[in-house]
Amino acid sequence: MGNGKSIAGDQKAVPTQETHVWYRTFMMEYPSGLQTLHEFKTLLGLQGLNQKANKHIDQVYNTFDTNKDGFVDFLEFIAAVNLIMQEKMEQKLKWYFKLYDADGNGSIDKNELLDMFMAVQALNGQQTLSPEEFINLVFHKIDINNDGELTLEEFINGMAKDQDLLEIVYKSFDFSNVLRVICNGKQPDMETDSSKSPDKAGLGKVKMK
């Protein structure tokens, strides 16, 4: 289990001592060593969601399940924690891209981005932009060859060159509350104050390195 590639590539690792604490906590919660999708949603308090919101959470879980066996084991779980603690926005964008690329073909089309936007909208509430406005804005700015699809290179480079667009994308796909529960709610050595700012959780810093 957990032998797939890490979620975000070359990311900052959790210190060894903290990893041991995480491991004990994970095994206390999940004695089998595996977390199911239902347990993931229970952990986050995300029961009774509508279909669109459920789709978004399912996709988040699937990106954590790197070896695609239907479970999240400890190595996959700690990789997710590493991502949350990662300060490099480029690494987060790589994960965003993987999240939006629903069919896993290495590119994002308008329908995939639209589906994910609407799923997050159902989870987080109404956005400033309509789904159509958001999709048109993103593709107008960063679909360099106008083929109706975004490659990973186009996605990351486009965001790096347009801070305003980066802010819009970050806010429009803000699932920091979902991820923060994992980080703050399950790590004994960290603060668990629900009012903790996104910056302190490493989620609100929109910067490229």
UniProtKB/Swiss-Prot annotation:
Listed binding positions for Ca(2+) 2 are 101, 103, 105, 107, 112
List ligand-binding residues for Ca(2+) 1. 65, 67, 69, 76
State the source organism's domain of life.
Answer: Eukaryota
* Annotated ranges, domain EF-hand: 15-50, 52-87, 88-123, 130-165
Q: How would you summarize where this protein is expressed among tissues?
A: Retina.
Function, in words? Stimulates guanylyl cyclase 1 (GC1) and GC2 when free calcium ions concentration is low and inhibits guanylyl cyclases when free calcium ions concentration is elevated. This Ca(2+)-sensitive regulation of guanylyl cyclase (GC) is a key event in recovery of the dark state of rod photoreceptors following light exposure.
GO molecular function annotations of the record: calcium ion binding; calcium sensitive guanylate cyclase activator activity
Sites of N-myristoyl glycine lipid attachment are 2
What InterPro entries does the record point to? EF-hand-dom_pair, EF_Hand_1_Ca_BS, EF_hand_dom, Recoverin
Q: Which GO terms describe its cellular component?
A: photoreceptor disc membrane
Q: Which UniProt keywords apply?
A: Calcium, Lipoprotein, Metal-binding, Myristate, Repeat
Q: Where is this region: Disordered?
A: 187-209
GO biological process terms on file: regulation of signal transduction; signal transduction; visual perception
This protein's name: Guanylyl cyclase-activating protein 3
A Pfam family the protein falls into: EF-hand_5
Gene assigned in the entry: GUCA1C
What residues bear Deamidated asparagine in this entry?
3
> What organism does the UniProt record list as the source?
Homo sapiens (Human)
Q: What is known of its domains?
A: Binds three calcium ions (via EF-hand 2, 3 and 4).
Q: What are the binding positions for Ca(2+) 3 in this chain?
A: 143, 145, 147, 149, 154
